[in-house]
Amino acid sequence: MKIWIDILTPKQLLFSEQIIEKLGKKYDILCTSRDYNEVSKLAKIRNFDLIFIGKHGGGDEKSKLKASIDRMEKMSEKIKTFSPDVVISFCSPEAARISFGLGIKHIAFCDSPHANAVMRLTLPLIEKLLIPHVISKKEFSKYGIDEKNIIQYKAIDAIITIKRRINRNAKLPFKKNNKKNILIRVEEEQASYTSKPSKIIPIIKKVVSEFEKENVVVLGRYVEQIKNLQKIVGNKTKIVKMSYDGKHLLENTDVFVGSGGTMTAESALMGIPTISYNAVPNIIENFLVKKHLVKRETDPNKISMQIKRIFEADDKQSQKRAKIIRSQMEDPIQKLIKIIKE
């Protein structure tokens, strides 16, 4: 059997790694992506074999459309030649359209019903959709997929991505001293579901001024974004691009301040004290807050106070809670294997 996996984000790459680990010996797997800085860098770090076709459309709607059409055109020939029996994606619009056009079974994972444009473009064309149990099927069925084709798994996606092996000898951006490491992740700016102005600038300024004696590292996403941050914050803190493995960074972090996305979920399940400034409100972040694995705070002063409390407490509560939650989760890839065999 031949399987095609289309990978568009770093999280999808890490998730796919575990799929390949379980299916790679048995099946012929082709992995594609688009030219997108964070994915290509992570693929290098992880030594992950990817074929890059097309590019990321950026933040503008017209350029997104052009990039998607261009990618579909280039990729459809490649896929026709490869002739897969099954397509796996994370709701890739190009994979949805190509698999529909070529009559190939398409199985997708998704935990982002808030990504309205992507849901509308993909869900009506997908055969089976796998979702975390904490999200209601109705959140997806409203976009045109029948509820009977939605399969829930008792886990969130971070349970898969934190399983990855990492190189613990790799270089890190933190200084080697006895100070606390504070890692701040800047929010996504170019996704179709992002429209609000940045929340992170006042948070960075406050944390940098309050904790100047600690190791504060800001993790950016795009070159332009990093340049803008450097102009605003200056040389008061280290601003880096994502040329590190997130798990390795988190293992060496005392407090993580995230936007509520993938790294926030990974940090929480790893038992790292985690604060979310909730850049894009979503159901997974909500679940983690309810389970007391994440503190949600948007006010820079209150975030600063939370960090102080975490440093003063210095207990293992986060790790204990995370261990309990992890033990209650199942492996979503086993559900995928079952569907492939059907």
Model region roles, listed by residue range:
Residues 87-98, 108, 249-286:
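A donor-sugar binding/catalytic signature common to diverse glycosyltransferases
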Residues 45-59, 205-240:
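Catalytic donor nucleotide-activated moiety binding site of glycosyltransferases and closely related
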Residues 71-75, 223-263:
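Donor nucleotide-activated moiety binding/catalytic core segment of transferases
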